[in-house]
Amino acid sequence: MSYIKKLRARLDSGEISAVELTKEYLAKIKEQDKRINSVITLCEAEALKEAEDADAIISAGKQGLLTGIPILHKDLFCTKGIRTTAASKMLDNFVAPYDSTVTKNCKDQGMVTLGKLNMDEFAMGSTNEYSYYGAVSNPWDLERVPGGSSGGSAAAVAAGFAPISTGSDTGGSVRQPASFCGLTAMKPSYGSTSRFGMVAFASSFDQAGIFGHYAEDVAIMLDAIAGECEFDSTCVGVKQNHFTQDLEKDISGKVIGVDESLIKDLPAQIQEAVSKTLDNFKKLGAEIKSVKVPDLKEALSTYYIITPAEAAANLARYDGIRYGYRNPEARDLDELYRKSRTDGFGAEVKRRIMIGNYVLASSQYDSYYNKAQQLRKVMTDQINQIFTQVDAIFMPASPSEAFKKGDKLDPVSAYLSDIYTIPANISGLPAIAFPIGFANNLPVGGQLMAKAFNDNILTQMVVQYQKHYGIEEFILQQARI
């Protein structure tokens, strides 16, 4: 079950050329994205040139699996010669002088970049309402959010603007939007993909991820972007075919841990979807085992102390001098810093910078930041202990279906949207979200988390699940090829 393989067959047979396929997707974006607002920059000329190059490779019989396959990138991955905004006024006119490792790996395999995608500013948000370029709409219901921060990445694939897209995941930013938009998306183990050229939010949490309809496509793409990188010291690399090596194997004997206390208070329709999903895994031969997951509220508090601290440090570089927005009315250096940052950053980014500077202050450091780091270590150890008993942990990807725009502009309410996804980021573990049912006629997702660098177990389990139970009901009509 793979869109990529379906497109590969069409391209190789001559049914369609890479240029024709690219034109189809570009036309669809230009016609339909006015309603969704998922694309910040459409790379029409560049895409057609890359498609021509792909056709030449195909004609010579030297194509790979991804040659000529269109892709959209979240607009925090640097793309040489194309602006990279992070959905911020601060970087509105920034044109990257180099490619991120993620985008370079895609280019090197002959993929066609259609454009750059909307997101919450600097990846800070769970709704994609915090963008300098306006909110993104969920293709399932245009009055609702697509999730965040990779909301544009999820909405674009759900709407059929590309078969695949890149995103980033700091606290659930690929998994929660996947749940809201009926997609499969994965945050791989921390260090398996390079962060070089990816605009930083919280460096010890950030990781590139992939959106698609099918888990097989997600696995194929993660193999494409993963690997060692000399420019990122945290990137340890993974072996070739790390994510796709076990996709054909059945999951009989796999043990899935479930903490019932995380499910009992969910809305009834989501509980039903979870119960059905676990029953389906049992039918495939998996064993369901009761486990106790660390307190998610403590995880949430830990996350929202450490990540703002890292963000405050990372965003200190945007000063109006080296690059980024520069206020034209400043009369001296102090005023230049102050006005450029005041005008250049949005409300949510400024909120997190202020929180970060507060917890890093010498008077507060031990009370907040130091304790949060200690708790992070304790929680990571507790989660890893669970993996001595199970192969994966299952939990919902979100506590609700997609909510309406404006419903959760209160920061604390919005932060709670990440409660199920944050543990994987705190501990650096791989986690995959996939559609499991509907609540109020909107898709909801489940999530599997595994031990570090056991990413292949997750892709294997979800590929086998989708092979037997399908995902057709989660693909919107306009997204079908």
Swiss-Prot record:
Role description: Allows the formation of correctly charged Gln-tRNA(Gln) through the transamidation of misacylated Glu-tRNA(Gln) in organisms which lack glutaminyl-tRNA synthetase. The reaction takes place in the presence of glutamine and ATP through an activated gamma-phospho-Glu-tRNA(Gln).
UniProt cross-references to InterPro entries, sorted A to Z: Amidase (IPR000120), Amidase_CS (IPR020556), Amidase_dom (IPR023631), AS_sf (IPR036928), GatA (IPR004412)
Native source organism of the sequence: Francisella tularensis subsp. tularensis (strain WY96-3418)
Entry EC no(s): 6.3.5.7
Alphabetically ordered keywords of this record: ATP-binding, Ligase, Nucleotide-binding, Protein biosynthesis
Catalyzed reactions per annotation: L-glutamyl-tRNA(Gln) + L-glutamine + ATP + H2O = L-glutaminyl-tRNA(Gln) + L-glutamate + ADP + phosphate + H(+)
Enzyme class: ligase
A biological-process GO annotation: translation
Assembly description: Heterotrimer of A, B and C subunits.
Protein name: Glutamyl-tRNA(Gln) amidotransferase subunit A
Active site: residue positions: K74, S149, S173
Gene name per UniProt: gatA
One cellular component (GO) term of this entry: glutamyl-tRNA(Gln) amidotransferase complex
Sequence similarity: Belongs to the amidase family. GatA subfamily.
GO molecular function annotation: ATP binding; glutaminyl-tRNA synthase (glutamine-hydrolyzing) activity
